[in-house]
Amino acid sequence: MKSLLDLFKQFTPDEHFDAIKIGMASPEKIRSWSFGEVKKPETINYRTFKPERDGLFCAKIFGPIKDYECLCGKYKRLKHRGVICEKCGVEVTQTKVRRERMGHIDLAAPCAHIWFLKSLPSRLGLVLDMTLRDIERVLYFEAYVVTDPGMTPLKKFGIMSEDDYDAKRKEYGDEFVAKMGAEGIKELLEGIDIEIEIEKLRGDLTGSEVKVKKNAKRLKVLEAFKKSGIKPEWMILEVLPVLPPDLRPLVPLDGGRFATSDLNDLYRRVINRNSRLRRLLELKAPEIIARNEKRMLQEAVDSLLDNGRRGKAMTGANKRALKSLADMIKGKSGRFRQNLLGKRVDYSGRSVITVGPTLKLHQCGLPKLMALELFKPFIFSRLEAMGIATTIKAAKKEVEAGTPVVWDILEEVIKEHPVMLNRAPTLHRLGIQAFEPILIEGKAIQLHPLVCAAFNADFDGDQMAVHVPLSVEAQLEARTLMLASNNVLFPASGEPSIVPSQDVVLGLYHATREKINGKGEGLVFADTGEVQRALDAGEAELHAKISVRLTEWTKDKATGEFVPETKLVDTTVGRALLSEILPKGLPFSNLNKALKKKEISKLINASFRKCGLKDTVVFADKLLQNGFRLATHAGFSVAIDDMLVPPQKAEILARAEAEVKEIEQQYVSGLVTAGERYNKVVDIWGKAGDDVSKVMMDQLKVQKTIDRNGKEVNEESFNAIYMMADSGARGSAAQIRQLAGMRGLMAKPDGSIIETPITANFREGLNVLQYFISTHGARKGLADTALKTANSGYLTRRLVDVTQDLVVTEDDCGTSNGSLMRAIVEGGEVIESLRDRILGRTAAEEVLHPETRAVLAQPGRMLDEDLIEELEAAGVDEVKVRTALTCETRYGLCAKCYGRDLGRGGLINLGEAVGVIAAQSIGEPGTQLTMRTFHIGGAASRAAVASSVEAKSNGIIGFNATMRYVTNTKGELVVIARSGEIIIQDEHGRERERHKVPYGATLTVKADQNIKAGTILANWDPLTRPIITEYAGTVKFENVEEGLTVAKQVDEVTGLSTLVVIDPKRRGSAKVVRPQVKLVDADGKEVKIPGTDHSVTIGFQVGALIQVRDGQEVGPGEVLARIPMEGQKTRDITGGLPRVAELFEARSPKDKGMLAEMTGTISFGKETKGKVRLQITDPDGKVWDELVPKEKNVLVHEGQVVNKGELIVDGPADPQDILRLLGIEELSRYIVDEVQDVYRLQGVKINDKHIEVIVRQMLRRVVVENPGESTYIAGEQVERSEILNTNEALQAEGKLPATYSNVLLGITKASLSTDSFISAASFQETTRVLTEAAIMGKRDELRGLKENVIVGRLIPAGTGLAYHQARKAKDAMDEAERRAIADAEAAELASAGTHDAAAEIDGSADTAD
């Protein structure tokens, strides 16, 4: 008892712990926690306000109300500490024990715990092997369950209604026992022998799939009970714990009323019903009355634990559902997300931000009043230290008076004490940065303009929050890691984040443009000082081309010293003057061009790589100052005259209108269908809009001027609008097009495009109809933005949750695996160069020179800019690099596999939370992604349909492996491959471009042909899809019957008739037949596919227009039928954010394509209604077959050989199939490419490695296939690291390891299936997660960041990783020491013991004689 009291006397530092275990409490355990039983439902006495004895707030059970004072007032003061008052029974101690002492309620009848009953899957149901419905009927007294059949034929676990029971009682008498309510269930649970059940189930894992699945589930639950040592009957409560009263307070309001926690109401109900039941049982009340009371008690306990999970929720006086224990921990306002993960911070303030153009990058302006409030404790301590104030109270007065000395002290305190600024929403780590405060007048925080990009802030009323790091460690971290001048790169892409924008860009761009025949052109200057004087004197203008003598500093690689080099440079006045701010070591050539935004970004990047961080920050600041100054001097203005409407516009519009008229004519005469007409019209107008904007830009771009020789020449325009867009300061070509070109096509609310475009632009003005059409797009834009923000935030949350425990934990895992990286080429354009893909990665194997085979890079070497330049010069076109997916570190990642830390520019540090960085990098641009693919201010954008492909570079033609073609009678090559590609290679055999060619295209080039850029490689009809024969012969129709499978369509104008294949659903005949063509040779025999005995059969799809007649002779490559392509709205491509979410959730796309399960030959089997049977036979004769719906487009034909994983039925691929058939690397490539496609469309740069990190987390679980000699069950999902550890242990013992297959989980699923139950519970489905964890008696090893935040420890990342590692090492040392001491003592005791024993034996020998 004494030690217990000592506990309460002083505050004990919390114990170090390394894991948290959750379990279920037995009734004994609950009673051991309790300090007494709560017998009465009363709370406090409303006259005296003292708690009632034995009530819910009883002082005897829970502790005193006032510190060290019993309830009746007999014992007061500290000297009686620990005395229990004999009058009122209260222990004299601190009040705070009322927060930790629990009570209990002894239930008069057992009650089931609703979580184990109703949270799906029902654990009670699994253990008892009964349905939830049946258990509920028993628990709520609607039916009996047989607990002991005795000698009767009744089954144990059998359910019987009341009438059945009465009948059986009459029949068998007292032979059997059947019970109702929780007692019956409890008895059944007690009767279960877990060991025997497990044995039985392990032997029964055969039979139908449903049965196996069910048994495996049950087995898992029983194994969990066995492993955790929890007894199943504990799921039924006999004792209910009562929460300490201070955690469910009763607060007196003014006016003599009380506000109470809902829990008190719920407890009151339980106690009332419990006492009533107890009384009824004592009185031996009729069964039916007691039964009703028991049911009500069960319901009351249910509501207390989880109100509203079953039946109607219990409500209080005001018809509002009461908040139960479960509600307090789940959801956004529950314990986890509101209080543990969403704590509020003291020492913080917020205010509006304004611009601080005079600040240095690492400074921010802090209003004096705010600083005074934030730094109060520091000021107080200084005042006391200086002896100005003697007490805190006096210091407070001094500060409130605002004497001059206080302000002096504030200056002193603030010096070198960084503060953190945060702008909500904090989407990535640059949303919080540290600055050194500068005291300013006024009430707004001043922010440096260059950090706005990182905060995504602007000065239109944004607010920011200030936080003060208090401890020295916190200040140190803020200073070294978070200072704004240390964060100059975006962690998402490694691009500089301190790039100037808007007016600064405009100023720099204007100053660095050149003008033909400007004043002072051709002058030569000795140095920049002379240039400045000439400019000031008006002898030379800013844009004049001149020559200047400049000194450049280059770094000597050997010595590392700067060497000056002076030379004459051709440049302009503006650029020459800017050269003064270049840091040493950066050549002037970087600056000797018109500085657009991209160029400035490159300039800062080059400076960072060549001159280091410090010089770059200073340089960026100087650029900013100059940009502001130059923009002011430039005196830009925009007038309506600057929006030049091209004179060719009228002509283009007239041409388009004529074309539309023609299409209308064709439609009226029935040459084209309504769908085709709409498509073509939209196409014509889309093209017209593009043409107008092209001539407009061409006109804006140039202006005529007279050069020095008096000749008229064109030069780049100085038009203000053009300069703004061209420099990247503001606006885009699409916006200028709306100002001066034409607005173009608009979209309807449902996303379809209105076929009449807005031909006017904003300069000419819109008429009423045009305005009306535009309003919709504008409104939709606003609505979309709101939706998008919420969606994007949720995506980020899921991503963070799945990756939060991924931290760099070691230097090198030593793997030699990796994935091959090559440039991404699409449609002949290099979308992403090899350089961008491998920069900052680690080579996985030697990189060899393609020709000399010399080693250019050793494995394990990081590929930096210089090395990549060497590789590019050598012509390396693919490199195997290490990736996050192939890293073999168990918990976490290794630095080599991750590569460069993009935010800092060096190899990643140990302890960096790369998972969270990846999640933020993908989530942060989410708000920029469109919800739907079109809409630029409502304007519809769509690509004109491509009908040919041309080469962009010179080279040699090659085809990919799957390309196949035939030569038709005209000698043209016709493509019959579904995934054919033309590859153009240079003379070294390096791939330059790659073009997809559709089925049925005509090739205009041959293999190995040398071509020039601009050559047309292939062309095709974009509006129809052909069906082509590969072989020659005579057409023989099968099942082509008019009115049954085909319909005749007669063209009214031309009188020609065509046959159209119609849908079998609309046919009279029940027998399903598919119209097809067989080919017959001259002898009337069916043509066979060479090398097989399959006849050539070509099936027609629904909607195909048959182009040949029965008995017609056809040659190879001839078109048998055409399928018109339907309108372009039909397959809505999910674009933007939903597409990214879909990929990361690993959802199967609707209308998914089908991949070949194995390599083999295609054949078609017997058809069923509406489906085709597709078969693949592999070389060993194994057959795989699948039914494919007829409306699907089958890409293969009889006798074709396909490879495993090849697309055989058209449609988007399912990532699960890709993983199963093609493996992890292919899957990762698919997801990375698809996600990047979405972001690239918006011009957002994200490094591949972030996406790889997330794919790694999606693949972290595996499915056990064959458990070997492990304890797993086949089909069980386990963590990859866990099974690897288990297998290592098994192999060490010479046992059979478990085999497993990869499984891809969506991010939500992966977050919930994490090993850490704390993390999963705080994410989603709290109840389910906790129920499962409790049954399994799970241990949370606190590996991730989230768990540690929740339990309030330092996170195991960054500086915290070192702390935890040091602590663990120390604990291990202490443990070893303790063991050593214990062993030594034991040895000593043992040796002493042997002495004694020897002495005893001697003694006994003596006494014997």
UniProtKB/Swiss-Prot annotation:
Its EC number is 2.7.7.6. The lineage of its organism: Bacteria, Pseudomonadati, Pseudomonadota, Betaproteobacteria, Burkholderiales. It comes from Acidovorax sp. (strain JS42). The RNAP catalytic core consists of 2 alpha, 1 beta, 1 beta' and 1 omega subunit. When a sigma factor is associated with the core the holoenzyme is formed, which can initiate transcription. This is DNA-directed RNA polymerase subunit beta'. Binds 1 Mg(2+) ion per subunit. Mg(2+) binds at residues 458, 460, 462. The keyword Transcription applies. The gene is rpoC. Zn(2+) 1 binds at residues 70, 72, 85, 88. Keywords: DNA-directed RNA polymerase, Magnesium, Metal-binding, Nucleotidyltransferase, Transcription, Transferase, Zinc. Transmembrane segments: none annotated. Belongs to the RNA polymerase beta' chain family.
